[in-house]
């Protein structure tokens, strides 16, 4: 993948008011979203550290990885997804129904957790996972700005020489 993932995994990050290695944050987040510390996709295992790098720097790639575990058939029905032998689904499959997931979760959160139906518990659980996914994915970029790839394209675009010359004149 071009990165020394193990070195990057040891970088300190601030999470929950504490400084932790990126490795701890990535493993804990993937465990919360997927209930496992790796993703099997396209014939290979993707470590939690590779996954979080994809989340931050290649979000369109991460969106295609089956990170979300969904067991409740009614929640799958809400998403318009047929239940398969696998329990794991991509963010891309969930994305079209995010507003409905949020609406259903807000309704379900009004019910005491012990009194919720399996559907209500499942939709609240999925919303919490989607919210965590969104926060992680946008930890390094502003939503709608296109991410690192778009920024690199802007820097290398046809106006790059003009911007560089203008900055040199400022200095």
Segments predicted by a language model, with ranges:
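Soluble extramembrane regions of membrane proteins in the secretory/endomembrane system
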Residues: 1-171
């Amino acid at each position: 993948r071009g990165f020394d993932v193990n070195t990057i995994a040891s970088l300190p990050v601030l999470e929950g008011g504490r400084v932790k290695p990126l490795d701890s944050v990535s493993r804990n987040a993937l465990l919360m979203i997927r209930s496992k510390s790796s993703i099997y996709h396209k014939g290979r295992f993707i470590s939690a550290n590779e996954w979080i790098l994809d989340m931050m720097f290649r979000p369109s790639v991460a969106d295609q990885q089956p990170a979300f575990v969904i067991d409740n058939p009614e929640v799958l029905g809400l998403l318009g997804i047929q239940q398969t032998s696998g329990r794991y689904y991509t963010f891309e499959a969930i994305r079209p129904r995010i507003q409905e997931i949020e609406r259903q979760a807000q309704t379900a959160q009004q019910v005491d957790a012990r009194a919720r139906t399996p559907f209500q518990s499942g939709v609240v659980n999925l919303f919490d996972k989607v919210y965590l996914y969104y926060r992680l994915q946008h930890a390094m970029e502003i939503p709608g700005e296109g991410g690192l790839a778009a920024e690199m394209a802007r820097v290398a675009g046809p106006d790059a020489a003009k911007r560089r010359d203008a900055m040199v004149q400022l200095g």
